Regions:
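Positively charged, helix-rich recognition surfaces that bind polyanionic ligands
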Residues: 1-395
Length: 395
């Protein structure tokens, strides 16, 4: 049967002024208190994407992983874990290449995932009158991630911008604001990532520096260099602390310091802190007994410090700072520097497991230490959630 195809170009909203860049308009809305919430999105290590919705006072309204997409159809609920699905497909493709078999396509799964994630975020933006904050990751990061099949990062940004460029809520009447005949433009026209800058309408970019490693309660972040170089530099490191003492009542060691004695990076911010060897940290290492594979162990920090001091012949109830600075043996000082690194390591993960948590070495005003495992819904409940939360707060 002969067929004729008649292609007709359609211009949407042809009466509009054609404003491609709406950045100034969005900034004006923000100045006039038109924005009520902020959405932070973290491209996490354990999650494809993690979302944190906060109000303008920094309170968490909602936090959720975007690994799992839940849909309802005819009264039934269907959940799909796209992280596991993509990982499984990657393994199958690797095996197929190795055995010269047909390689399954992964592109459709990625596109399906992106479409659903973009729908969730755009709907939330309109519902909560929110702007979206993303990490400003360099192009090298994106290209590096593309070596992995789960690299949904660059495609996600582009899809979100294009979706928000002409947003229609199909659940609304066509005459309502946001309906078919009154679509919303929430981003500027996408040209390229190089031209994107720090803003595209209601989409903003903030520096990616340490967002997942900032204590969400106290704001503490590790600015130390704890790499062991030699005896002299290790002694100089400990000499910069204001005080190093053992708290017998709490059974932990305290390291009081002023960041100005170590670095200029904390200038114009809070500089006086006290580190406490509270709780445990996870040490990750190559295990010779397991063919040099990655392994991990949980370290009780206070106990480890006590053992080092005991071997060095140091009385923990005495002047610890002077005693440490008087040490001459590499073995003791190197071990102390390694323990300092663990003390400052707020993100703790075990390879090839779901163990991934945040614990702070700094107490808040009530004497409590942030621990993401405590189940406090008012705080981030895992390391990637903490990243999304701090990204939103930076916005």
């Amino acid at each position: 049967v002969d067929k004729f195809q008649f292609h007709v170009p359609i211009t949407l909203n042809f009466k509009a002024t054609g404003r491609g860049n709406i950045n100034d308009k969005v900034l004006e809305i923000i100045r006039n208190n038109g924005i009520k919430h902020v959405i932070g999105i973290d491209r996490g290590e354990r999650h494809l994407l993690y979302l944190s919705l906060i109000d303008l006072k920094g309170n968490i309204i909602k936090q959720m992983t975007l690994n799992d997409i839940v849909n309802e159809y005819r009264g039934h609920t269907y959940a799909t874990n796209y992280k596991d699905l993509l990982a499984e497909r990657e393994d199958n493709r690797t095996e197929a290449r190795r055995n010269w078999k047909k390689i399954d396509n992964i592109k459709e799964i990625k596109q399906g995932y992106l479409a659903q994630v973009v729908h969730i975020i755009s709907k939330m933006m309109v519902e909560y009158k929110a702007i979206v904050i993303l990490e400003d990751l360099n192009m090298g990061f994106m290209r590096g991630r593309q070596k992995i099949e789960r690299s949904v990062y660059e495609q996600f940004e582009k899809s979100l911008i294009e979706k928000l460029n002409y947003y229609v809520d199909k659940q609304k009447d066509e005459e309502e604001v946001g309906g078919l005949l009154h679509a919303l433009q929430l981003t500027s026209k996408f040209k390229s990532f190089k031209e994107l800058g720090k803003q595209s309408g209601c989409l903003f970019y903030v520096p990616a520096w340490n967002t997942s490693k900032i204590d969400p309660v106290t704001g503490f972040v590790n600015l130390f260099d704890t790499k062991y170089v030699n005896v002299e530099k290790a002694r100089a490191f400990f000499s910069n602390f204001d005080a190093i003492r053992y708290n017998a009542e709490k059974d932990w060691f305290e390291f009081a310091f002023n960041y100005s004695n170590f670095t200029d990076k904390a200038k114009d911010t809070r500089e006086k802190w006290t580190l406490c060897t509270h709780g445990t940290s996870i040490r990750t290492f190559r295990n010779p007994s397991k063919l040099n594979q990655w392994d991990s162990e949980e370290v009780v920090l206070t106990d480890k410090f006590k053992k080092v001091f005991e071997k060095a012949g140091i009385d923990i109830c005495g002047n610890l700072k002077n005693a440490i600075c008087a040490l001459k043996e590499k073995a003791h000082l190197e071990k102390l520097m390694q323990l300092m690194k663990l003390l400052l390591q707020m993100r703790n993960s075990k390879p090839n497991t779901e163990v991934d948590y945040m614990i702070s070495p700094v107490a808040d005003e009530q004497g409590n230490f942030y621990d993401s495992r405590c189940g406090n819904s008012a705080l981030p409940d895992n390391a990637d959630a903490n990243g999304a939360y701090n990204i939103a707060r930076k916005g």
